């Protein structure tokens, strides 16, 4: 910035390089880079803790951190997990979330002998904090997984100032279902399967906007910038494209959410899997090696094989948890119904009122596909619309449509 204004300059970009190491060398070097990234991010003159879900990513961070604490005579590591009131009672397994975290958290906390805290969130409070989460984000983002991370960070901050967590491992090492699909060509962001479904709830005045065409163009613009090597296999090209899209779009959204929800509560969130050296190395690992044994994050699992329990290593990926409690559903339905009854609501300049009423009457079941990611269905879509109305009002947004 100077007297002539602001100038934007890109200071870093991925580079495509030939990967020359065999599987054994790659596994060993990857483990070394992971440990180094975690240990460097443990350096602090204030209390440090880790988030622990019992999944692969947070478990390895917590394992390395606990060993470092022990080696440096810092006592036991504090680890923190999150859950919602009575979630075990109402939990329903699905393709993306085959089991809840509780069993795995206890197993891993015992394995590393951490001082573990399980933070249980009240479902009504979760709904009531949608506004605070929206204000912390400056945007409507990810519904109740915003407010839950906000409340979780608020509780963790009572015990620590820095928290390490496992975000970015899925984007960097191929943890999402779309990484294992066989694409001839990638025409659309792989996490936007519900785009047409979303268009169906738009207000009639904007329903004809070329939203799908715009999204496809943005996707293709990004793909045109993907660093590649000449002569690579189609599979390796697609892996680079998927990784690039995830790093530039999906991961940025998650990092933005993480940074804003934690820092709104004066908690510094650190993400070792986003370490620059680690990302640069992982980007050039061939697809068959990265998805070792045809599994999501196959190589990452193999690099941790001798250090973590096999149960943890082989546990299927489970996303950040959402509440399944009907109390939450009733709370957000009431909040959205209050918006429907408000003659000054701005929401209906964007969203069709009849579709919203139908969503309330069916408790979100009229919207069957994930709004974002893999779990944002039903009550989460309702919560997102509440966030949208909050944002439109709190920031006095004027729509020129």
Report the location of each language-model feature.
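Active-site-adjacent "lid"/gating segments
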Residues: 1-50, 59-80, 85-86, 93-132
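Adenosyl-5′-phosphate
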Residues: 5-6, 16, 162-164, 191-401
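Structural preference for long, well-ordered alpha-helical segments in enzyme cores
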Residues: 30-38, 60-65, 108, 133, ...
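Glycine-rich loop motifs involved in handling phospho/adenylate chemistry
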Residues: 48-56, 96, 270-271, 320-324
